[in-house]
Protein backbone atom coordinates (compact mmCIF):
# COMPACT_ATOMS: atom_id res chain seq x y z
CA UNK A 1 0.00 0.00 0.00
CA UNK A 2 1.37 3.40 -0.96
CA UNK A 3 1.64 5.96 1.81
CA UNK A 4 0.35 9.44 1.02
CA UNK A 5 2.46 12.25 2.41
CA UNK A 6 2.14 16.01 2.16
CA UNK A 7 3.82 17.88 -0.64
CA UNK A 8 7.20 19.04 0.74
CA UNK A 9 6.13 22.69 0.53
CA UNK A 10 3.51 21.97 3.19
CA UNK A 11 6.00 20.48 5.63
CA UNK A 12 7.39 23.94 6.41
CA UNK A 13 5.46 26.29 8.66
CA UNK A 14 4.35 29.79 7.71
CA UNK A 15 7.09 31.22 9.94
CA UNK A 16 9.71 29.17 8.09
CA UNK A 17 8.38 30.40 4.73
CA UNK A 18 8.46 33.99 6.01
CA UNK A 19 12.18 33.61 6.63
CA UNK A 20 12.60 32.71 2.95
CA UNK A 21 10.22 35.22 1.32
CA UNK A 22 11.46 38.50 -0.11
CA UNK A 23 9.62 41.66 -1.17
CA UNK A 24 9.94 42.22 -4.94
CA UNK A 25 12.16 45.03 -6.18
CA UNK A 26 9.35 46.40 -8.36
CA UNK A 27 6.68 48.68 -6.90
CA UNK A 28 3.54 46.95 -5.66
CA UNK A 29 0.32 48.84 -4.93
CA UNK A 30 -1.22 48.17 -1.56
CA UNK A 31 -4.10 46.06 -2.91
CA UNK A 32 -3.63 43.55 -5.70
CA UNK A 33 -4.73 40.27 -7.21
CA UNK A 34 -1.94 37.78 -7.75
CA UNK A 35 -2.50 35.86 -11.00
CA UNK A 36 -0.37 32.77 -11.55
CA UNK A 37 -1.42 30.46 -14.38
CA UNK A 38 0.71 27.65 -15.74
CA UNK A 39 -1.86 27.01 -18.46
CA UNK A 40 -3.46 29.50 -20.79
CA UNK A 41 -4.98 32.48 -19.08
CA UNK A 42 -6.92 33.46 -22.22
CA UNK A 43 -9.98 31.47 -21.12
CA UNK A 44 -10.30 33.52 -17.91
CA UNK A 45 -8.55 36.83 -18.65
CA UNK A 46 -11.76 38.87 -19.04
CA UNK A 47 -13.34 37.50 -15.83
CA UNK A 48 -10.23 38.42 -13.86
CA UNK A 49 -9.94 41.86 -15.44
CA UNK A 50 -13.59 42.67 -14.62
CA UNK A 51 -13.14 41.42 -11.04
CA UNK A 52 -10.12 43.70 -10.63
CA UNK A 53 -12.05 46.72 -11.91
CA UNK A 54 -15.07 46.01 -9.66
CA UNK A 55 -12.81 45.70 -6.62
CA UNK A 56 -10.29 48.43 -7.48
CA UNK A 57 -7.36 46.00 -7.41
CA UNK A 58 -4.13 45.96 -9.37
CA UNK A 59 -3.39 42.75 -11.29
CA UNK A 60 0.05 41.22 -10.84
CA UNK A 61 0.39 38.39 -13.34
CA UNK A 62 3.70 36.68 -12.66
CA UNK A 63 3.70 34.16 -15.48
CA UNK A 64 2.91 36.49 -18.37
CA UNK A 65 5.91 36.61 -20.70
CA UNK A 66 4.59 39.91 -22.10
CA UNK A 67 5.05 41.50 -18.66
CA UNK A 68 8.80 41.18 -18.13
CA UNK A 69 8.80 43.05 -14.80
CA UNK A 70 6.53 40.49 -13.14
CA UNK A 71 7.60 37.51 -15.27
CA UNK A 72 11.04 37.57 -13.66
CA UNK A 73 9.63 37.08 -10.15
CA UNK A 74 11.86 34.83 -8.03
CA UNK A 75 10.51 31.99 -5.84
CA UNK A 76 11.18 34.11 -2.74
CA UNK A 77 9.25 37.01 -4.24
CA UNK A 78 6.44 34.67 -5.28
CA UNK A 79 5.96 33.62 -1.66
CA UNK A 80 5.87 37.27 -0.53
CA UNK A 81 3.37 38.13 -3.27
CA UNK A 82 1.06 35.28 -2.20
CA UNK A 83 1.18 36.32 1.45
CA UNK A 84 0.42 39.96 0.67
CA UNK A 85 -2.21 39.53 -2.08
CA UNK A 86 -5.86 40.34 -1.49
CA UNK A 87 -6.76 37.25 -3.53
CA UNK A 88 -4.94 34.72 -5.69
CA UNK A 89 -6.29 33.46 -9.03
CA UNK A 90 -4.45 30.38 -10.24
CA UNK A 91 -4.46 26.99 -11.92
CA UNK A 92 -1.30 25.96 -10.04
CA UNK A 93 -1.13 23.34 -7.30
CA UNK A 94 1.66 25.19 -5.50
CA UNK A 95 -0.10 28.55 -5.66
CA UNK A 96 -3.03 26.80 -3.95
CA UNK A 97 -0.64 25.35 -1.36
CA UNK A 98 0.82 28.73 -0.47
CA UNK A 99 -2.64 30.32 -0.45
CA UNK A 100 -3.70 27.69 2.07
CA UNK A 101 -0.57 28.06 4.19
CA UNK A 102 -1.00 31.85 4.39
CA UNK A 103 -4.82 31.66 4.80
CA UNK A 104 -5.43 33.71 1.66
CA UNK A 105 -8.60 33.99 -0.39
CA UNK A 106 -8.09 32.19 -3.68
CA UNK A 107 -9.88 30.83 -6.72
CA UNK A 108 -8.49 27.92 -8.63
CA UNK A 109 -9.28 27.54 -12.32
CA UNK A 110 -9.27 24.31 -14.33
CA UNK A 111 -6.89 24.17 -17.25
CA UNK A 112 -8.83 23.90 -20.49
CA UNK A 113 -6.01 22.96 -22.84
CA UNK A 114 -6.32 19.54 -24.43
CA UNK A 115 -4.26 17.01 -22.52
CA UNK A 116 -4.17 18.98 -19.26
CA UNK A 117 -7.68 18.28 -17.97
CA UNK A 118 -6.49 15.41 -15.75
CA UNK A 119 -3.83 17.55 -14.06
CA UNK A 120 -6.56 18.99 -11.85
CA UNK A 121 -6.86 15.78 -9.78
CA UNK A 122 -3.97 16.82 -7.54
CA UNK A 123 -5.51 20.25 -6.91
CA UNK A 124 -8.94 18.73 -6.26
CA UNK A 125 -7.48 16.25 -3.77
CA UNK A 126 -5.72 19.10 -1.95
CA UNK A 127 -8.91 21.17 -1.76
CA UNK A 128 -10.99 18.18 -0.63
CA UNK A 129 -8.50 17.41 2.15
CA UNK A 130 -9.01 20.87 3.64
CA UNK A 131 -12.72 21.30 2.71
CA UNK A 132 -11.90 24.09 0.26
CA UNK A 133 -13.76 22.76 -2.81
CA UNK A 134 -15.79 25.98 -3.00
CA UNK A 135 -12.62 27.76 -4.10
CA UNK A 136 -12.90 26.13 -7.53
CA UNK A 137 -14.05 28.59 -10.19
CA UNK A 138 -17.22 27.21 -11.78
CA UNK A 139 -17.69 29.81 -14.49
CA UNK A 140 -19.77 32.32 -12.59
CA UNK A 141 -18.61 32.40 -8.96
CA UNK A 142 -15.57 34.66 -9.26
CA UNK A 143 -17.10 37.19 -6.83
CA UNK A 144 -17.91 34.54 -4.23
CA UNK A 145 -14.93 34.74 -1.92
CA UNK A 146 -15.48 31.91 0.49
CA UNK A 147 -14.79 32.34 4.16
CA UNK A 148 -12.64 29.33 4.87
CA UNK A 149 -12.48 27.53 8.19
CA UNK A 150 -8.78 28.16 8.78
CA UNK A 151 -8.91 26.51 12.23
CA UNK A 152 -10.02 23.28 10.58
CA UNK A 153 -7.33 23.69 7.91
CA UNK A 154 -4.64 24.18 10.57
CA UNK A 155 -5.84 21.17 12.59
CA UNK A 156 -5.75 18.89 9.54
CA UNK A 157 -2.45 20.35 8.37
CA UNK A 158 -0.84 19.64 11.75
CA UNK A 159 -2.05 16.03 11.74
CA UNK A 160 -0.86 15.47 8.16
CA UNK A 161 2.52 17.11 8.87
CA UNK A 162 3.10 14.78 11.82
CA UNK A 163 2.05 11.70 9.83
CA UNK A 164 4.19 12.73 6.85
CA UNK A 165 7.26 13.45 8.97
CA UNK A 166 6.87 10.15 10.84
CA UNK A 167 6.66 8.25 7.57
CA UNK A 168 9.63 10.07 6.04
CA UNK A 169 11.79 9.62 9.15
CA UNK A 170 10.97 5.89 9.30
CA UNK A 171 11.59 5.46 5.58
CA UNK A 172 14.97 7.17 5.78
CA UNK A 173 16.17 5.15 8.81
Regions found by a protein language model. Give the residues of each.
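Active-site anion-handling motifs in enzyme catalytic cores
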Residues: 1-173
